[in-house]
Amino acid sequence: MKRQLALGTNNLNKVKEVSSILMELGIQILTPKDLKVSFNPEETGSTFKENALIKAKELFYLTKIPSIADDSGICVSALKDEPGVYSARFGGPELNDEGRALLLLEKLKGNQNRKAYYACAIAYVDESTEQSFEGRCEGLISEEYDRIGIYGFGYDPIFIFPPLQKPFSQIQEETKNSVSHRKKALDELLKFLKTKP
């Protein structure tokens, strides 16, 4: 039987990204929907790591299947690392991904400091273990929203990846998945999972 991990997200883009990266270990990823559980934990942590652990613990409690969850976001130097853990809620619940990205551009208007990084913390929880892994991807915030790119989600249309000098929204998934903050955290998780029976 395939090894199974429950993934604490309802975001299909994250499911796809995590599944493609963990495929090499032959791990079957199960979502809350697959497991028919209602999963909507309150993210009350002040760090990505705390929020990831809240989600992984909740999912393990509901399913009793070894669980992973991530919390990630974008941190902008000129905004004192905001929106940070509030990235998905930045600007309020009425904004979608594009609205949040445009609001971020508005807040940076005229600011020369465009440094930013994507951060990701992934937590693993089972009956005897609580572990977390972190990754970062450094970049810059663009001057305008990219309407050409067809890849990615969230803040990808305004996040410039310096080695390729283009926004994540113009970088194919395989390439992005090899350099992303989530990939770096998942690589650490992979190392850990290889040591677990």
Curated annotation (Swiss-Prot):
<dbReference type="GO" id="GO:0036220">
    <property type="term" value="F:ITP diphosphatase activity"/>
</dbReference>
<feature type="binding site">
    <location>
        <position position="176"/>
    </location>
    <ligand>
        <name>substrate</name>
    </ligand>
</feature>
<dbReference type="GO" id="GO:0005737">
    <property type="term" value="C:cytoplasm"/>
</dbReference>
<dbReference type="GO" id="GO:0009143">
    <property type="term" value="P:nucleoside triphosphate catabolic process"/>
</dbReference>
<dbReference type="InterPro" id="IPR002637">
    <property type="entry name" value="RdgB/HAM1"/>
</dbReference>
<dbReference type="GO" id="GO:0000166">
    <property type="term" value="F:nucleotide binding"/>
</dbReference>
<feature type="binding site">
    <location>
        <begin position="181"/>
        <end position="182"/>
    </location>
    <ligand>
        <name>substrate</name>
    </ligand>
</feature>
<dbReference type="GO" id="GO:0017111">
    <property type="term" value="F:ribonucleoside triphosphate phosphatase activity"/>
</dbReference>
<comment type="subunit">
    <text>Homodimer.</text>
</comment>
<comment type="similarity">
    <text>Belongs to the HAM1 NTPase family.</text>
</comment>
<dbReference type="GO" id="GO:0036222">
    <property type="term" value="F:XTP diphosphatase activity"/>
</dbReference>
<feature type="binding site">
    <location>
        <position position="71"/>
    </location>
    <ligand>
        <name>Mg(2+)</name>
    </ligand>
</feature>
<dbReference type="InterPro" id="IPR029001">
    <property type="entry name" value="ITPase-like_fam"/>
</dbReference>
<keyword id="KW-0546">Nucleotide metabolism</keyword>
<dbReference type="GO" id="GO:0035870">
    <property type="term" value="F:dITP diphosphatase activity"/>
</dbReference>
<keyword id="KW-0378">Hydrolase</keyword>
<dbReference type="Pfam" id="PF01725">
    <property type="entry name" value="Ham1p_like"/>
</dbReference>
<feature type="binding site">
    <location>
        <begin position="153"/>
        <end position="156"/>
    </location>
    <ligand>
        <name>substrate</name>
    </ligand>
</feature>
<keyword id="KW-0479">Metal-binding</keyword>
<protein>
    <recommendedName>
        <fullName>dITP/XTP pyrophosphatase</fullName>
        <ecNumber>3.6.1.66</ecNumber>
    </recommendedName>
</protein>
<keyword id="KW-0460">Magnesium</keyword>
<dbReference type="GO" id="GO:0046872">
    <property type="term" value="F:metal ion binding"/>
</dbReference>
<dbReference type="GO" id="GO:0009146">
    <property type="term" value="P:purine nucleoside triphosphate catabolic process"/>
</dbReference>
<feature type="binding site">
    <location>
        <begin position="9"/>
        <end position="14"/>
    </location>
    <ligand>
        <name>substrate</name>
    </ligand>
</feature>
<feature type="binding site">
    <location>
        <position position="72"/>
    </location>
    <ligand>
        <name>substrate</name>
    </ligand>
</feature>
<dbReference type="GO" id="GO:0005829">
    <property type="term" value="C:cytosol"/>
</dbReference>
<dbReference type="GO" id="GO:0009117">
    <property type="term" value="P:nucleotide metabolic process"/>
</dbReference>
<dbReference type="InterPro" id="IPR020922">
    <property type="entry name" value="dITP/XTP_pyrophosphatase"/>
</dbReference>
<keyword id="KW-0547">Nucleotide-binding</keyword>
<feature type="active site" description="Proton acceptor">
    <location>
        <position position="71"/>
    </location>
</feature>
<dbReference type="GO" id="GO:0047429">
    <property type="term" value="F:nucleoside triphosphate diphosphatase activity"/>
</dbReference>
<comment type="function">
    <text>Pyrophosphatase that catalyzes the hydrolysis of nucleoside triphosphates to their monophosphate derivatives, with a high preference for the non-canonical purine nucleotides XTP (xanthosine triphosphate), dITP (deoxyinosine triphosphate) and ITP. Seems to function as a house-cleaning enzyme that removes non-canonical purine nucleotides from the nucleotide pool, thus preventing their incorporation into DNA/RNA and avoiding chromosomal lesions.</text>
</comment>
<feature type="binding site">
    <location>
        <position position="42"/>
    </location>
    <ligand>
        <name>Mg(2+)</name>
    </ligand>
</feature>
